[in-house]
Amino acid sequence: GAVGNDSYGKTVLDSIKDFNIDKTHIRTENGDTASNRTYLTPDGDRYYKDDSWNGGVFSSFALSASDRELLHSSDMVHTTFSGPNFNDVIDCCREKRFPLSVDFDICRDFDTIEKYLDCISLLFISGDEPTLEKAKQLSSKYPNTIFIVTLGENGSTAFSKGTAYHCAAAEVSEVTDTTGCGDSYQAGFIASYLADGNIETAMSKGSQTAAQTLSFIGGFRY
């Protein structure tokens, strides 16, 4: 990825400096760091306005040859459908297969989604009842893809080869800010699933990780 050479970019890099994260593929570019101005309701639900998103240097981010080599050797690659390099990641995966996880957020264009399912291992989508039914159908058609539908306070449901797994949302005493809950769920799920390949355990870990994020302002504590 890339950050800008502004104060936000420095904050991002400072926030992860003490973690065991390989930072060699984070570029610092001339310009603004991507940002998304977030607003909260009195109940802690986050929302955005039309002008919230500023893509900054991330808008023109492109994979380098070194980045592509990293993808090819990764245990799991996670990306977003809305990211500027999504199609490049898909091309890389089709060129030389690697486990791929994709966040489709609130996308409901299942005809488009289906075009990529040949190389997606984990598919995350924020859903509702119609989404659950569609995910179940697709999971029978694409047995190599696990479909995980997050349902907010109603927990999450995953489908693998037509079989459904449900996990209740972890209980929290108070909701401070929902920003980053979906990302946290995905991180917890992926880490757990890579460890033992158990879908139900991964869902539980995702739920617990999301619940922790609900307790503070922002997507991660820094």
Language-model regions: role of each:
Residues 1-35, 205:
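Substrate-binding N-lobe of the ribokinase-like
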Residues 2-3, 80, 201:
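Residue-level marker of alpha-helix boundaries and capping positions
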Residues 8, 73, 92, 119, ...:
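Residues within well-formed alpha-helices
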Residues 9, 34, 86, 186-187:
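A general structural signal for well-ordered alpha-helical segments in protein cores
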Residues 15-18, 23-27, 40-166, 197:
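Ribokinase/PfkB-type carbohydrate-kinase core domain
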Residues 136-222:
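Conserved phosphate-binding/catalytic region of the ribokinase-like
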